[in-house]
Amino acid sequence: MQITEIFRSIQGESTHAGLPCIFVRLTGCNLRCVWCDTAYAFHGGTKMSVEEILASVNELSGRAVGQAFQPVQQPSSAEGQARKPVLQAISLVELTGGEPLLQPEILPLSEKLLAAGYTVLIETSGERFVGALPKAVIKIVDVKCPDSGESGTFEMKNLDAVDAKDEIKFVIASRRDYEFARDFTREHELAARVRQVIFSPVFADPEGKWPALDARSLADWILSDRLPVRLGLQLHKFIWDPAMKGV
């Protein structure tokens, strides 16, 4: 597999935002969104086997290769009942890109991560069919809005391939994008199909290539239309330099 980077960070997006997470960024993408903030993953990368990737994830997570997650026994509560064990390792892994579904080895990689006890997220552009992924994988599927330059690339079969644990995300750069996302959400009853529908405002490019969408404007639109969606901000860009890689 071609891998751009593997790193440990705080999950910045989705309903898992704020949690420690291991990211595996795969190299290559067949789309060219105007506001893409990971264009460095289009080319290059390092060739790694599934076993090498798993070993790297285990190391970053705090686990030894082949070991199960080790619980820390908590003191009993005041009622005398044992509390839920706390894991000593990071158990959340996201496979992202680029477009991770371009590499067929994504299937055995996700299966091995699941078998090792990880919770696995896959973030995808929505252009590729997600139905072949293991059932336990949590799919975060984009629908590209008009200002991305890639509107119309969404694989409509994905609407029937997602379920109540998955998420659908729209990255929104303008009022036009918002209206597209709003209408798509309503027409296809997305809130009834997935765990969460996420509207995420575009973050300004550090080099000024594109502007931000004011999050307050997006919040006002969502509230005005009473949409059953989550406003999603890129938390990691508030913690670290927005241009920084590996976070």
Q: What is the meaning of each model-derived region?
A:
Residues 14-17, 34-37, 243:
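Short, glycine/acidic-enriched capping/hinge loops at junctions between secondary-structure elements
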Residues 1, 8, 20-21, 32-80, ...:
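Conserved Radical SAM active-site core
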Residues 101-247:
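Conserved AdoMet/S-adenosylmethionine-binding subsite of the radical SAM
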